[in-house]
Each structure stands twice: as C-alpha cells, then as structure tokens.
Amino acid sequence: MISTLGIVWGSTFLFIELALQGITPLWLTSARIVFATVITSMIWLMRGGRLFTTNETAWTRLGIIGIISTALPFQLISWGQQYVTSSFAGLAMASMPLFVMPLAYFFNTNEALDRRKFIGLLIGFLGIIILFSPDFTQGNDTSILTTLGKLACILAAFCYATNSILMRKLPSIDPVGLAAMSLLIGSFWVVLWAVTIEGPPPIISAETLLI
C-alpha cells in the first residue's frame, strides 16, 4: 500500500512536467483540481454529504484550508515545474516535515522541540540550501528562474505543512467531506486566477488531455 502510494505520488510530478508542454500552468492546475473536485464530491454525496459531524463548525478555517491545501500548492508546483525537473519537485515535497515541526511548536500543538530535533531541523534546512546552491553561483536569467521555480516548490511543501497543522484544530468532520470542500474552495480560486491572468482556457491536444 505504501509503495503504491509512493509511486502514484511521485509520478504526479512527471505527468505535470509532460502536461506543461501543451498547456499553461494555471489552466493545468484548474483542470487537475476541477476533475478531482467532481470525483471527490460525487463520492462524498453518495456517502450522505455530511460535513461537520457535530454542532461545532469552523467555516473560516475550512476556507483557509481550502486555499493552502489545494489552490496555492497546486499552483506553485505547476508554475515551478516550468523551470525545475519533476525529480526536484518530488524531492521538495519531502521537505514538508521540516516545516511541520517548527509550525507545530509555534502553534502550541504539544509538539516538543528538544535539542535532538532542533539539530535534525538544522541538518534538513542545510540540505535545502545545498539544493539551491548551484543557482547562487551563476546569476544569469536562467538560474534566477530556476531558483524561483525551486522556491515555488518549497513554498508548496510549506503550504502542505501549514495545512496539516490547521486540520488538527478542526472540529469533528467527515474526511471525505473535508477533501471535497477543500477541493471545491480551491477550484474556485484557481479557475478565477486562471481566467484573470491567462485568459480563456486554451485548446489542448489529445495527448495533453490524456495526461
């Protein structure tokens, strides 16, 4: 199960890289998130369509989660992969735990930050700096775009880390409903950004559509 999940998760970045050859990043993100919204919402409705399982609600927090769990990271990854490889994008996602620990400590989620964990964090962030170091020594336009692409992927990982902390503070909620609502909120913003920035959706080839 874990190996299958790893293959599916890792191959996502390869498919994004291939799809970007035939569609702009904002509309690629829109297509991905709208498709996922439709499928997840259908499953949620078949399960009864209930969201909060108690009288306690948290709509504002859910709205924020919808943005930082889908809209922002999906967009950042698609934009960043114009300038970085799919392997780097996948590697950048592995930095998420580095952000979770200090965020958990900052938001007082009973996450202790002892010396051993602190040293581990320093080593992890040193690794991120090493990933960026080749770009710092060049300074041309290509390296600047590459650096920005890498930064976008790292920021996407930061969004996922922040989302994992915020979800801990949600009241009792149906997990499928949470996924559906997050995607629905995210799809609204992503499509709005795509129309505003890139204009009407482009005509894409059959090969890109299959990807």
Outline where the language-model segments fall:
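Transmembrane alpha-helices of multi-pass small-molecule transport proteins
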Residues: 20-72, 97-104, 158-163, 179-198
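Hydrophobic transmembrane alpha-helices of multi-pass small-molecule transport proteins
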Residues: 40, 95, 103, 115-135, ...
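Glycine-/small-residue-enriched transmembrane alpha-helix faces in small-molecule transporters
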Residues: 1-30, 79, 139-169, 183-192, ...
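A helix-boundary/kink motif common to multi-pass secondary transporters
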Residues: 24-25, 85, 112, 174-175
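Hydrophobic alpha-helical transmembrane segments in multi-pass integral membrane proteins
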Residues: 72-79, 127-138, 186-201
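Specific transmembrane alpha-helical segments of multi-pass solute transporters/efflux pumps
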Residues: 7-16, 41-93, 129-130, 202, ...
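Hydrophobic alpha-helical transmembrane segments
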Residues: 3-4, 30, 59-64, 91, ...
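Loop-to-transmembrane alpha-helix entry segments
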Residues: 53-60, 90-93, 109-130, 146-147, ...
